[in-house]
Every structure is written in C-alpha cells, then in structure tokens.
C-alpha cells in the first residue's frame, strides 16, 4: 500500500474563514468600483484611477469588519485576493475578445464611457457614432459591467483588461460556495470540491470568460446573491449589506438580472413572513433599499431614462417597437418557431450538438453512441454556451443518469426550506420564456446542483457515491466543452497577433469594417491606419477576425 509521507488532514480541517474573506474582497472590489463610477457620473466628475484606489481601500477595510474572524484569516484573504485580482487583470489583458457582441456594442460602450460619455447627464449616443449605425444597445442596456470595464481600461490602457471582472466574480462565487458548503452545511472536502466544480465549470461562465458578454457575469452574480440571501434569511448571518451590493450589480448587468433578483427576493420575503417573522422588518427594509438604489439610482441611466424616453424600463426588449422577439429568435433552429417553452427546452437539451439556424432544425440525439459523442466535440469550438446540448458533448446521456437522482429526491420527504429554494429557482426559470437557451437562464445549473447535493448527503452510502460519480462525469463534460471554446479563442488570438506583429510601428492602408472597436486593436499595437482606398489594391481580412469586417492592403510582391 502506498503511504503518503505528509498528513494533509490538519490543513484540510482548518477553519474556512480565509475563504470567506477572499470571496468578499473579490466581490466587493469591482462592485464598489461600479458604485463609485455611478456616483462620479451623478456629480459630473471624470472617472479615473482614484476610483480604483478608493475601492481597493474600502474593500480591504470591509473584510475586517464583516464577521468576528481571526485577523490572520482576513490578512490571508486580502493577500490572496490581491494576487487573484492582479492575475485576473493580467490574464484578461493577454487575449482579444473574439466574440460578436463583445466586439460590437459592449466595446463601443466601454470606449465611449472611457472617453468621457456620461450616461446620466449626457445625450444618448447617436446611431452614427455606434458600430453598425445602431446605438440602441449602448444607450438602453444596463451599464454596470461597462462602468467597471471602462475604469479598468482607463487604469491599464488595455480595454481587454476589463474582461477581468468575469474572473473576479467567478472566483468570488467559487470561494463563497466552498465556504458555504464547509461552514454552513458541513460537507466533506470531496463533496465540496466536486460540487463546487459542478457549479463553477459552467459553460456559460468559462465559455464567456474571454469575452465582454454578460451572461457568465449574470450566472456568477446570481449565485453570489443567492448565497448571501440564504445566509441572511435562513442562517441569520449579517450579510444584509452584502446582498444589497450583490443586488445592485445583478440588476444592472442584464435586464434579466432585475427579474431574477426580484424573484429571489420575493421568495425570501415569503419565507421570512412564514418562518422567520423576527427578521421581517429588517428583511423588508434591506430589500426595499436594494430596489430603490439598484433601480432608481444605480439603474438611473438605464431603467429611469428608458422609462422617461421610451415608455418602458426594459426597452429595447420590451415596450413600443421593441426588439425582444427578434433578439430571442435570432438563435432559433428551424423547428423552434412553433414549439412552446417546454418543447424548446426538451429539444435543445436532447439534441445532437450540431449547428442550427432558421434553415437547420435540431436533431434528436441517439444516446450512448460513443462515436457520435466524439464527433460532436468540435462543435463546441465556438462561442459558449452553444444552443444545442449546451452543457457538453454527452449532455443527453447525463440527463438519463440524472433520473435516479431526481426520483430519489421526489420519493423522499425533504425539508421545507429545500422545497422553497427549488420553487424559487424554478420560478426564476419559468418567468423567462426562452429558458431553453442556457445563455438566458444560466441558473439551471444551480437547480441541478441542489438535487445532486441532496443525493450526496443521502443516508445510503451508495446513493452518495452515485451522486459523486454523476458530478465527476458532469465536470468532465463541462471541461470538454469549455476546452474547445478556449482552443478557439487561443487560435484566433494567435493568428491575429501573428498578423499584427509585423505591422507594429508602421502605417498600414486599411478598409474600415463596421465594428469600431477593431481600430483600437490597431492603435494599441502602434499601427497607424490609413483609410485612403487604393482601387487597384487587394484588401484581405485579418486572420483570426471573423466579425469586424476590417481589411488591410496586401503588399504586392
């Protein structure tokens, strides 16, 4: 028998306070940046490095005041948090966003804000100043992520560093969930690690970590807000102010964040009213304050201005002349137009992972076909999450393996609080008509995690082992999907950098495309674009760039 020459047990059983400190620091730093940026907008003050410095000091100070934790745990948490923050900014800055929306209106908004546009007091951006001659999304979409990213752009001089908030909130969720499972639910380390991997290796989060898309942010913030909420109303922990901060960011990252956050708070209010009346006044006060600040103040440039100018807070996805239906149907396969929401969900999650569009229908997947699974893996070499089998190449098989876990949950009486939690999560899914699309309802993974976690703690050892085995397979499935996406990102970046490098410190004749953000790539590489077109020249697209439409003049040999 192999003997391990070192005993890790004392280290594994140490208090988990430092995990909480790390999580809170990583969560607070970008969140305070967002709040201070909005404060600067209201006051008409130019945003700059001072916001980041103040946010850093406040975040460090707050983690020492939250709970009666050992000073050493807070110092450790702060030190690790600083390293992870620097690492996130550095890594994000090394990769260009290759996605469609990320290079389009997301970077448009970040550039405009960094150049001084104040979305509270300034006039809306005219269509002529936006990529694709469409400023609707820049003017009317929630602006929390753009506020933080514009500040990071000003701080580093590299717009790509703004993507680091994907890592920061994702890592915050990982440490927060690890602490929650260990400190609140007394999960063993093996159960904790597998369940945290199950939740965190989301194809939404990791599939968008190299882009400015906000669906992954929505998922991380949803999870963070949910944990703070459970801590507050069930475990009676002093997380009221943290959940307010989480709500502020959640509802201003994406419109659906407001809807999902509202559903979670409604469920929490009903629980407190029925089971924790001593918390009722405090809970309602915290929730009301969160809504007023989140929608009326931080959300002023979005929800209030949309209502005043367009008659609906959620314009352009709702209200007069809205684009909601069109946006939702962009990713519809041919066979989805006549299906209801449940039929679309079933079709999407049992389909072969294949390319679909308005001319190509989903195809029901033959299960447990090893060759088919292997052949479908390259499909995930794309922006995540994909629409068909979004969890990975053998998602269909995992749904079959999930059936025993679901049935064991149903036949066994569960605690009331578990039914309430499931009901709230299901409600947050059902309220989204397009919950078949994992991008729009990423919390589906959290719902599955609750069933798995319950089975892990089943009184039968074999049921617990089966849940661990299922979690392991799910993690492998996620890794296969995400690794393909990362490969796609790395290859595109390699090709683009390979082409831009020889052009550094030179003037290059270019044909401008429709995405304005590509010009920034040229300028950050010290390339001076010359827009005088040569009708006799041959212009070729930049390698690794599939969307912007920019071309350069190829030198004649």
Locate each region found by the language model.
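Hydrophobic/aromatic-rich transmembrane helices and adjacent perimembrane loops
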Residues: 53-54, 111, 214-222, 250-253, ...
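Lumenal/periplasmic acceptor-binding loop at the mouth of the active site in multi-pass
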Residues: 114, 118, 122-124, 144-154, ...
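Membrane-embedded, hydrophobic transmembrane alpha-helices
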Residues: 1-73
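Transmembrane-helix motifs of polytopic, lipid-linked glycan transferases
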Residues: 31-35, 59-67, 151, 161-185, ...
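Membrane-embedded, lumen/periplasm-facing catalytic core of multi-pass transferases
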Residues: 469-530
